[in-house]
């Protein structure tokens, strides 16, 4: 009996000395906003659904906040990281904010400039109402580019530009007849094409370099949470690589259907093909695209101070350089 007691005491002593088995660290919770609902948000959805964020020790909550408000939420410290366009980063920086683009997920201006079925030619928009997105947002600039290309000048031609929320709201405004035209992403535009609405201009075919969306954070947050930001970026980059592998098409299409609420196979196929056709294999910010953003914002009177900025002032390429130098990008190709 004494021998058994001593054995138990010895085991307890060893357990105390060596400590209990280490428990897995709790994942870091983080809120990640996206400023639009379109197929280029898919890398975020896939990273969450396929466990890539979890792989890097993150518990990510994805939340939709319309782009301009998402940028404001970051500046207010309410949201640490978001997927928004370089237009909003430009506005923040020229107002004294410290937002910066660290990944590039959509590096071109790809919108359908849509009109109601009653509009047969662009000239018929004179004196009519056109919906734009948030002030200085990518959809707004796409509208200005489309009007320029079609030879229309809002002030001269009495075209009323109305700031109408996100894409679902602009689509709804077109259907309701409260506006005659609007810029929509191709996946939403295709819905209206099937209903008889007209594509007056496909800006994607014009190949306009443009940083439409990217992963954005404040420089102060990056400085105080470098590993969290890097892990988040790694998860998204793996999401991009997953999407671009043909073997994963069925999973990606199901995810698009669920998140975009698309149920028709032809629309899903077009959304998928557009995504894999434009999603960069190495999702880094496009310096040419950012330069184009700055130029267009000045040209259309959206932010005169943008003329004083260089692309390097609103972009941080350090993570992309690290991923390139370490072979992380190459390992996923």
Question: What are the residue ranges of the model-derived segments?
Answer:
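Sec/Tat signal peptide C-region and signal peptidase I cleavage site
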Residues: 20-24
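Conserved C-terminal helix/tail region of periplasmic/extracytoplasmic solute-binding proteins
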Residues: 294-333
């Amino acid at each position: 009996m004494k021998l058994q007691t001593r054995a138990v005491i010895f085991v307890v002593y060893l357990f105390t000395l060596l400590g209990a088995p280490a428990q897995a660290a709790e994942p870091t919770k983080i809120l990640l906003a996206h400023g639009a609902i379109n197929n280029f948000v898919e890398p975020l959805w896939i990273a969450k659904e396929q466990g890539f964020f979890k792989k890097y020790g993150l518990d990510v909550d994805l939340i939709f906040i319309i782009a301009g408000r998402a940028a404001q939420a970051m500046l207010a410290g309410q949201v640490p990281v978001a997927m928004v366009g370089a237009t909003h980063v430009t506005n923040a920086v020229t107002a004294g904010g410290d937002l910066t683009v660290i990944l590039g997920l959509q590096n071109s201006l790809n919108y359908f400039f849509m009109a109601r079925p009653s509009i047969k030619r662009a000239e018929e928009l004179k004196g009519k109402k056109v919906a734009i997105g948030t002030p200085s947002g990518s959809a707004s600039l796409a509208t200005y580019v489309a009007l320029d290309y079609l030879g229309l000048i809002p002030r001269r031609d009495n075209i009323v530009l109305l700031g109408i929320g996100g894409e679902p709201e602009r689509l709804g405004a077109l259907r309701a007849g409260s506006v005659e035209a609007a810029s929509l992403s191709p996946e939403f535009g295709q819905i209206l094409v099937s209903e008889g609405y007209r594509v007056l201009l496909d800006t994607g075919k014009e190949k306009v370099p443009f940083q439409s969306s990217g992963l954005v954070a404040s420089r102060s947050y990056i400085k105080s949470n470098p590993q969290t930001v890097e892990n988040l970026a790694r998860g998204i980059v793996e999401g991009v690589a997953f999407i671009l592998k043909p073997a994963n098409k069925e999973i990606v299409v199901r995810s698009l259907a669920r998140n975009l609420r698309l149920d028709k196979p032809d629309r899903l196929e077009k959304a998928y093909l557009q995504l894999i056709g434009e999603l960069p294999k190495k999702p880094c910010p496009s310096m040419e695209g950012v330069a184009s953003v700055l130029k267009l914002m000045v040209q259309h009177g959206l932010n005169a101070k943008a003329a004083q900025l260089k692309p390097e002032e609103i972009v941080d390429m350090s993570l992309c350089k690290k991923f390139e130098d370490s072979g992380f990008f190459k390992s996923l190709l």
